[in-house]
Amino acid sequence: MTALPLRPAAVSRQLFVSSRPVSWVNTAFPFAAAYLLTTRQIDLTLILGVLFFLVPYNLAMYGINDVFDYESDLRNPRKGGAHGAILDRRLPPVTLWAAGLSCLPFVVYLVIIGSPISWLVLAASLFFVVFYSAPPLRLKERPFADSVTSSIHFFSPAVYGLVLAGATWTWQLGLVVASFALWGVASHAFGAVQDVVADREAGIASIAPVRGARFPLRLALACYTLSGLAMLATAWPGPLAAILAVPYLLTVWPYRRITDAGAADATRGWDRFLWLNQITGFGVTLLLIWYAILTR
């Protein structure tokens, strides 16, 4: 039987789900905050940069992942919503083209207005977006490197915003970035736990299937703790952000003794994590506004 042709609305809907809309703010906000707090002005570069890190960047990051993880996603009962799309078998080429073409005009603009060091940061960010999932590197199958690479996806937009805006680097600013990076490592490690069985059956050698469910959970607890501690040494009101690590620790803690067989139960914690990010983001926004007022 001949498959029905894909309608544009159906393609758009699958690409939308594949881009993980619930996570858009996690990449756009760091860029916006870093750039705006450095330049103290809203300009075309800020607007286009936010749009780029809001949608095309996420479509590239998650869409490429959905293409190369298709077989494991078919075995994964949580796929098909906020956790990612199960693409129609005819969609992988469309997804890759959509990701590349949607990014292209933004990247061209950012290269034109940027400096050589900003080109380097942007190139590194996009390199890790692609080769986290794509062969030959497929970094998501290299334990611990997968968590670090995933973290780069989220803190690199902030680093790029700082570099593009010409920020002056201090050790305290470095601690803020390090704290964000540790949060990213912890979040990936926690998120990987729920897919132990599906990824192992698909032969995906990421941190959780290789090391078992408990190791990434303990890594997540350690990195969330270090992330909060790092903020204690930053400029006021930065130390208050250490409090924001506590809800993440409380979310992960109940699963610390989980077994591989019961790892799917961690999905409940991950669902809380997704919404916790929105609440934490609000707290970070208030602190950034306070910082902007103090330093204006």
Please provide the spans of the model-predicted regions.
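Small-residue-rich segments of transmembrane alpha-helices in multi-pass membrane proteins
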Residues: 28-34, 147-163, 208-213, 269-287
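C-terminal ends of transmembrane helices
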Residues: 62, 128-140, 192, 255-263
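Intramembrane alpha-helical segments
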Residues: 8, 13-16, 82-168
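Acidic (Asp/Glu-rich) catalytic motifs at the cytosolic membrane interface
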Residues: 53-82, 186-208
